[in-house]
Amino acid sequence: MGPPLWPDLQEPPPPGTSSQIRSPLLCDVIKPAPHHDVTVRVVPPPRFLPLLLRPLPSDGDIAMRRDRGPKPALGGAGEVEPGGMAASPTGRPRRLQRYLQSGEFDQFRDFPIFESNFVQFCPDIYPAPTSDLWPQVTRLGEVANEVTMGVAASSPALELPDLLLLAGPAKENGHLQLFGLFPLKFVQLFVHDKSRCQLEVKLNTSRTFYLQLRAPLKTRDREFGQWVRLLYRLRFLSASAVPFTQE
């Protein structure tokens, strides 16, 4: 295991620590300038798209083909955007997609993105399933430990996403800020607790974070099911673990 990218990282609190000790936030651990450490080659869209092989029948997975016309989305959630991503229920780009389209990240403007809002938690402080997760609210009314996580493809020719994006509210003004960009080959994603819609994110620096989906109750199970199918497609699940669960 190589040396950590950021030597000033603090270790998470040991099991049994008092609930008054706050879990380190992703935005505190991951510095806001990830582009100095990770270089992603962006392929410009071709004049014509190559003919891709038909994906295996998967009941509407997150295959990132740029076919025209409506297709079943993840979990049968209606139509999808170009690239096979599940379309927003309102028909408008979601928060992370709008942020990337604001002009600061021109290379990501046309990337199809699948994203969701999560709340970071520590299983030692908020053990599941005996206690609920209480978001940390700032003076600006924003959820301090909220994390917007999305996956994207750096090329329209890819059938699956190859980038993981992490964003959260800035401490200064509460506006969304991109603080993590990682190739998916350097990240491991697991289902931590399916019943509570919780994911485990393990970086190549051996740091592990836990995220719980923050979505309306009526759409939460369907949205989390999309992430489960994505994880299954990416083959990040351990063969020795219980299906869809990382012990």
From Swiss-Prot:
- For the region Disordered, give the residue spans: 1-22, 60-92
- Does the record's keyword annotation contain Disulfide bond? no
Gene Ontology process terms (BP): defense response to virus; innate immune response; positive regulation of type I interferon production
Alphabetized UniProt keyword annotations: Golgi apparatus
- Main localization is Golgi
Q: Where is the composition biased (Pro residues)?
A: 1-16
On subunit structure and binding partners, the annotation says: Interacts (via N-terminus) with RAB2B (in GTP-bound form).
**Protein name, please?**
Golgi-associated RAB2 interactor protein 5A
Per the UniProt record, the source organism is: Homo sapiens
Q: What gene name is listed for this protein?
A: GARIN5A
